[in-house]
């Protein structure tokens, strides 16, 4: 009640105007949140450690400074940004009861989440293009996927997502929030926040849907097209061994794509079926922002021979240092 009274102001029109939101955490299991914070904290620390280690390994090994691993390094930075955008605040809610978040902070978090998720989708598309050129046009690969192209593609994704995401928090900030300010969530999601608005929130829902289709929808379509062309090229190879080797270079990337976009689709379905305030979609939303940053380095380390060898070398050096 203290949070509620402190975060509502009376305007000249005698309406209660919200000045801050209260994030209640996972719906229906508030008493378990201290226990849930432990795996979340471990996932966050493992995400930071694993992604940082990947970056160091790529930086220190000239043999790994190839387009595929450079894109992986960029993905690692995006993953750390995404995890850091949400997990520290969630842990503050669970450990210190820091449930209050100001409107500017909330809208900034909405922007950051959408930006990093869009960047992840964009980098996955860049990695799909890299695999397409490597398998379908191997002789032209060095002249096509150059350092200049990688830089331009990355800058394009930054600009694209920066522009695409801007309308989402801007429209959310223009809504009239009155009376209710408690959100059954661990983070500021656009649809969760705008569901508290007193005025028409359809522009926000339409905007998010359109931008999602223009951004991640187009990324996924191009990724699918890339893999159709890759599969067509592989099936034309005379050697089964060569075909298997070509497809093996895509296994890590395909694993990330399937996990990332499957959860995106499930979350979208839960929003369309009006399940926004129940435990499952809230939990999925949080996991979608923390599992990929933790999973991506592990997938590549286990499935990529060069990176696995570099990991083993680092672990051997660390073990030797500890024993000495």
Swiss-Prot record:
Keyword Magnesium tagged: no
Annotated family: Belongs to the G-protein coupled receptor 1 family.
Membrane topology field: Multi-pass membrane protein
Keywords from the named record: Cell membrane, Disulfide bond, G-protein coupled receptor, Glycoprotein, Membrane, Olfaction, Receptor, Sensory transduction, Transducer, Transmembrane, Transmembrane helix
Segments traversing the membrane: 35-55, 64-84, 109-129, 149-169, 206-226, 247-267, 282-302
A Pfam family annotated for this UniProt entry: 7tm_4
Residues carrying covalently attached carbohydrate according to the record: 12
Extracellular side: 1-34, 85-108, 170-205, 268-281
GO molecular function, one term: G protein-coupled receptor activity
Keyword Nuclease part of the UniProt annotation: no
InterPro entries registered for this protein in UniProt: GPCR_Rhodpsn, GPCR_Rhodpsn_7TM, Olfact_rcpt, OR51/52/56-like
GO CC, alphabetical: plasma membrane
Subcellular location: Cell membrane
Disulfide bonds listed in the record: 106-198
Ranges in the topological domain labelled Cytoplasmic: 56-63, 130-148, 227-246, 303-322
Annotated source species: Homo sapiens (Human)
Predominant location: membrane
Described function: Odorant receptor.
UniProt protein name: Olfactory receptor 56B1
Lineage start: Eukaryota, Metazoa, Chordata, Craniata, Vertebrata
């Amino acid at each position: 009640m203290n949070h509620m009274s402190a975060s509502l102001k009376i305007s000249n029109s005698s309406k209660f105007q919200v000045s801050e939101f209260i994030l209640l955490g996972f719906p229906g299991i508030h008493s378990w949140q201290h226990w849930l914070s432990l795996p979340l904290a471990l996932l966050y620390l493992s995400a930071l450690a694993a992604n940082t280690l990947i970056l160091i390994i790529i930086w220190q090994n000239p043999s790994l400074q190839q387009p595929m691993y450079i894109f992986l390094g960029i993905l690692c930075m995006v993953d750390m940004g995404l995890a850091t955008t949400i997990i520290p605040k969630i842990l503050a809610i669970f450990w210190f009861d820091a449930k209050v978040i100001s409107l500017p902070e909330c809208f900034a978090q909405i922007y950051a989440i959408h930006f990093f998720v869009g960047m992840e989708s964009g980098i996955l598309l860049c990695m799909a293009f890299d695999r397409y050129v490597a398998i379908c046009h191997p002789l032209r690969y060095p002249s096509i996927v150059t350092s200049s192209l990688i830089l331009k593609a990355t800058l394009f994704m930054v600009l694209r997502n920066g522009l695409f995401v801007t309308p989402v928090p801007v429209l959310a900030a223009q809504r009239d929030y009155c009376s209710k300010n408690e959100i059954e969530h661990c983070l500021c999601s656009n649809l969760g926040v705008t569901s508290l608005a007193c005025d028409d929130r359809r522009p926000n829902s339409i905007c998010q849907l359109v931008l999602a289709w223009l951004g991640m929808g187009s990324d996924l379509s191009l990724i699918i097209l890339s893999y159709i062309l890759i599969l067509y090229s592989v099936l034309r190879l005379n050697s089964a061994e060569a075909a298997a080797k070509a497809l093996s270079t895509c296994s890590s990337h395909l694993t990330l794509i399937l996990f990332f976009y499957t959860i995106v689709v499930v979350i979208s379905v839960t929003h369309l079926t009006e399940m926004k305030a129940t435990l499952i979609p809230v939990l999925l939303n949080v996991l979608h922002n923390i599992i990929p940053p933790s999973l991506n380095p592990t997938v590549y380390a286990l499935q990529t021979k060069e990176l696995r060898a570099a990991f083993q070398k680092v672990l051997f050096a660390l073990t030797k240092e500890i024993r000495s």
